Amino acid sequence: SADYLKKEYKVFPTPQKVTYGEGVTALRKQVNLVMGDQLDIYTRNRLKSVLQDNQVSYTTGKSAVAGATNIYLGVHGQGSQAEQNLSKVSAGLFDKIDAYALTIKDNSISIVGKDTDAVFYGLTTLKHMLKESQVPVLRNVTVEDYAELKNRGFIEGYYGNPWSNADRAELMRYGGDLKLNQYFFAPKDDPYHNKKWR
């Protein structure tokens, strides 16, 4: 049997709960995107870039396309098609920080987030799953995830030579893949970090 039938995805940070189902969903032929109105441009573009990185072509629409693999994105509580298509998730999931649920089943992918940023984090999980797959075929699965901490990021606090803008951009891309959400610029030769420190 094909490897992807028993693949267990390694996503980091490790999602809170992963439940595998039977069968697979392929992103090989027609793929249709149905995105809720509450999603910002960054979240919409995240989905498109994840698909483009895996050579998956797509169309966008307001509703499902028969015979296509439909990908639904939506914000919890907004009556989205994504939420209608989601597998049952743990009670109280969306009360947690940056919570999202991702369901792959019946030739569709649904990601519902507490808000548009949480949908972005769900898409990052999808990105990791596809990166581990030799072909764009994914096991049917439900992922429930949320953050333990609201503020997650890194500090650029240096003595001497600062990072280049290219270094910063690369670290932000890497941080995005780790679902970080903050960057602090705090050079140690800033007067408020030494002589004027209070």
Where are these regions (language model features)?
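Aromatic-lined carbohydrate-binding surfaces of glycoside hydrolases
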Residues: 155-198
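Acidic, contiguous N-terminal accessory segments
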Residues: 1-117, 121-145
